[in-house]
Every structure is written in C-alpha cells, then in structure tokens.
Amino acid sequence: MEIRKIKAQTVCDTVKKLFTDCNYFIGKDIMCALETARDNESSPVGKSVLSQIIENDKIAAREEVPLCQDTGMAVLFVEYGDRVVIEDGSFDEAVNEGVRRAYIDGYLRKSVVNDPVFDRINTKDNTPAIIHTKIVLSLIHISEPTRRSYIS
C-alpha cells in the first residue's frame, strides 16, 4: 500500500493562504451577483448601498485588506486521506499554525477566546481552529464552502 507524505509546512502554508484569500477576495460569483442585484435594484438608496459594497470589495482585493472588520472564526472541513502521513509535525498543529500566521500576518481581527465560559482570554491569534475531519481514500484537501485548496 502506497503512503502519501505531506510536510506539515505545506499544510501550514496552504491554510494560511486559504484564510488570507477568503478574507481579502470575495470571489467572482459573489461579485457578479452583487453587480446584478445593483443593476436590478429600483431603489436609489438600495442601489447606492450595493455600489458601496462592491467598491469596498474591490478596494479589499486591490489593497489586500480584509473585506470586513469581523473576520470570523477559523472553521475547516477537511477530507483526510487514509494513507496520508504528515511529516515534521502533526496535522492539527500545522492547521493551527497556518491560521495563526494568516490572522497575524494578514492583519485579520483576532477575536477567539481561550475559554468562552470563565476566563474569556483572547488567544491573540484566532486559534484554536475548529477542524471537522472526514477520513477518505488517498487524498487530502482543505476547503471552506466556496473555495477548495488541494494539497498535492
């Protein structure tokens, strides 16, 4: 049986890029939907609001800054190959380091607290990520609802 080896740094780098990109770039499909909504809007106020949202999205992409001040929590849905081995670290540690780097290096709002019930101390890097894992045959990829990132 063939074993697939993936370096922890590859997982980390992929997660960092995924989270940075999804906070800076809205996606062509959503931009198209916003433009269509603006063009079909009959209310001048509604048209103006949609135009401002579109302009904000263009600025975020051009200047690589977050689309919104609330950049949310890191939630991943991972399909993890049954014959995959992570080298030089663990999968969870690599994912959390990627999230950490994205939120720190990408200037994303860090709002996760370590213990939401008692101490409520901000982790200052938006970790730990919430990782939903499903074991699948032979391949690994990390995705969020509108984007996929495959690790080769």
Residue ranges and their predicted role:
Residues G72-V136:
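A generic, well-ordered mixed alpha/beta core segment in the N-terminal half of proteins
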